[in-house]
C-alpha cells in the first residue's frame, strides 16, 4: 500500500511519538507483512552483495517497518488532522508542507501573556479584562482577515545570527534585535458567541517562583513590544496610512482584579476567546491569539488548539482515521478502508466505510486484535527510543506549531 491518508492526533503527545505508534500498529499487521518481508529480503541480498557479509538486524531496521512520514507538525498541546504518507506516498508530503490552507479552532484566555503563547509557558504579563466587550471583540474578524504581517513567537524553530530563537529564550537572554515579521494570509476568522464567557474549565495561569519571573524579564522587550499589524485589506478599506496598528498599551491589572484573583484562587475564571480561523501555511496561531489580545488592550494565551482541516482532509468531512481504527478493529476491516482511501483520496467517508466493512466481515472469521501497547519486536524498541529522544528535544526546544 502506498499513498496519503489523514489521522486524528490527540492532545498531549508529539506528532512524532504519535506517528511512531501508528507505524508500529501498521508494521505488525499481516496487511503489510508481505511487503516488509519483500523489502527486507531485497535489503539483505543487496547488503551481502556489496559487503560479502550477512546483514545484522540493526542494518535491516529501516526496511523492517512501514515507511512513513507526516505532512506538517502539530505540537503536543494541539489535536486534529495529521496528514500521513506511507510507502511511495511519502514523496507527496512536500505538497502539504507549504502552500496549503488549514482550518483551526482555538480557545484562549484573556488577561495573561506567556513566553510560549500557550498554557505551558511562563507568565510575561498580567493585564486588565474588565474593559472587554463582545462588540469590540467582533471587530478583530475584519482587522486580521487578509494579507497580514505576523511576528513569529520566540519559541518557533527559527534562527537569529545562527542561533535558534528558543535558545535565547531558554537561556533568558534578550534577542540581538526584533524578530522580523512574516507575511501570512488569514482567509477567514470567526469569533464564536461564547467568547468572553467565564463558564469553562480552564484555570488562569498564576505567577510561580521569583526565579522564573527574573528569567523572563530579559525577554519582555522582545516579546511584549512586538509590533502589532492589521491586515492590508483592513487598512486600505479604512484609509489608514500604515498596517502598523495604532493601539494603546494594554491596561494594567487593576488592584480590584488582583484581589479578586487572589480571593478566588484556582476557581477564578478569566474571560475566554473562542474562534475558528482559515489560514495559509506559515501562520502562527499563537501569534494570532497574542495579537488579538493586544488589539483589545489586554493580553491572551492559548489553552486549546484543534486542526480541523488541512487541504481536503477534514474532521467535519469524516475522511480522517483515528488510531483506534488500527489498534482495536480487525485488520480485515481497516485494511479495506485504508486501501480505498489511498486509491481515492479525501473523497472517501472513512466513518461510513468502516461501518460497511464491519458488517461485511462475519464475526466468526474476525481476528483477535493484540493491543499495540504490548511489547513487540525490535522495531518497537527503536520506536520507544526515538520517541523519547524526540520528546526530550521537544522539552528543550518547545517547538511551536507553524501552520
UniProtKB/Swiss-Prot annotation:
InterPro entries: PsdUridine_synth_cat_dom_sf, PsdUridine_synth_N, tRNA_psdUridine_synth_TruB
CC terms in the record's Gene Ontology section: mitochondrion; nucleus
One Pfam family, short name: TruB_N
Compartment(s): Nucleus; Mitochondrion
Enzyme Commission number: 5.4.99.25
Swiss-Prot/TrEMBL keywords: Isomerase, Mitochondrion, Nucleus, tRNA processing
Catalytic residues, chain numbering: 75 (nucleophile)
Tagged with keyword Mitochondrion: yes
Gene Ontology MF terms in the entry: pseudouridine synthase activity; RNA binding; tRNA pseudouridine(55) synthase activity
Gene3D superfamilies per the UniProt record, alphabetical: Pseudouridine synthase (3.30.2350.10)
PANTHER family: PSEUDOURIDYLATE SYNTHASE TRUB1 (PTHR13767:SF2), TRNA-PSEUDOURIDINE SYNTHASE (PTHR13767)
Miscellaneous comment as given in the Swiss-Prot or TrEMBL entry: Present with 3990 molecules/cell in log phase SD medium.
Free-text function comment from the UniProt entry: Responsible for synthesis of pseudouridine from uracil-55 in the psi GC loop of transfer RNAs. Also catalyzes pseudouridylation of mRNAs with the consensus sequence 5'-GGUUCRA-3'.
Family: Belongs to the pseudouridine synthase TruB family.
Name this protein carries in UniProt: tRNA pseudouridine synthase 4
Source organism of the structure: Saccharomyces cerevisiae (strain ATCC 204508 / S288c)
Amino acid at each position: 500500500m502506498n499513498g496519503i491518508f489523514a489521522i486524528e492526533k490527540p492532545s498531549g503527545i508529539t506528532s512524532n511519538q504519535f506517528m511512531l505508534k501508528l507505524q508500529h500498529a501498521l508494521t505488525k499487521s499481516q496487511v503489510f507483512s508481505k511487503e516488509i518481508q519483500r523489502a527486507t529480503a531485497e535489503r539483505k541480498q543487496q547488503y551481502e552483495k556489496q559487503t560479502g557479509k550477512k546483514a545484522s538486524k540493526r542494518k535491516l531496521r529501516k526496511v523492517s517497518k512501514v515507511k512513513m512520514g507526516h505532512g506538517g507538525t502539530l505540537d503536543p498541546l494541539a489535536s486534529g488532522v495529521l496528514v500521513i504518507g506511507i510507502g511511495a506516498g511519502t514523496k507527496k508530503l512536500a505538497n502539504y508542507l507549504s502552500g496549503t490552507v488549514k482550518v483551526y479552532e482555538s480557545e484562549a484566555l484573556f488577561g495573561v501573556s506567556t513566553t510560549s503563547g500557550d498554557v505551558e509557558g511562563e507568565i510575561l504579563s498580567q493585564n486588565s479584562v474588565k474593559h472587554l466587550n463582545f462588540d469590540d471583540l467582533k471587530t478583530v474578524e475584519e482587522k486580521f482577515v487578509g494579507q497580514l504581517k505576523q511576528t513569529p513567537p520566540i519559541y518557533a524553530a527559527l534562527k537569529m545570527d545562527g542561533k535558534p530563537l528558543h535558545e535565547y529564550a531558554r537561556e533568558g537572554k534578550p534577542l540581538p534585535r526584533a524578530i522580523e515579521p512574516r507575511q501570512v494570509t488569514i482567509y477567514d476568522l470567526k469569533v464564536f458567541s461564547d467568547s468572553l464567557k467565564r463558564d469553562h474549565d480552564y484555570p488562569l495561569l498564576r505567577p510561580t517562583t521569583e526565579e522564573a519571573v527574573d528569567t523572563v524579564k530579559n525577554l519582555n522587550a522582545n516579546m511584549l513590544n512586538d509590533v502589532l499589524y492589521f491586515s492590508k485589506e483592513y487598512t486600505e478599506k479604512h484609509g489608514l496610512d500604515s498596517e502598523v496598528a495604532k493601539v494603546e498599551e494594554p491596561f494594567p491589572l487593576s488592584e480590584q482584579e488582583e484581589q479578586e484573583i487572589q480571593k478566588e484562587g484556582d476557581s477564578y475564571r478569566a474571560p475566554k476567546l473562542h474562534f475558528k480561523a482559515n489560514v495559509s501555511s506559515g501562520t502562527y496561531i499563537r501569534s494570532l491569539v497574542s495579537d488579538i489580545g493586544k488589539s483589545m488592550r489586554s493580553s491572551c494565551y492559548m489553552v486549546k488548539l484543534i486542526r480541523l482541516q488541512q487541504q481536503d482532509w477534514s474532521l467535519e468531512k469524516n475522511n480522517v482515521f483515528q488510531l483506534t481504527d488500527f489498534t482495536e478493529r480487525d485488520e480485515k476491516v481497516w485494511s479495506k478502508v485504508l486501501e480505498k482511501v489511498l486509491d481515492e483520496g479525501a473523497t472517501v467517508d472513512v466513518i461510513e466505510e468502516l461501518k460497511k466493512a464491519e458488517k461485511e466481515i462475519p464475526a466468526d472469521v474476525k481476528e483477535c486484535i493484540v493491543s499495540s501497547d504490548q511489547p513487540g519486536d525490535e522495531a518497537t524498541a527503536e520506536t520507544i527510543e526515538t520517541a523519547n529522544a524526540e520528546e526530550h528535544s521537544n522539552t528543550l526546544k518547545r517547538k511551536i506549531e507553524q501552520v
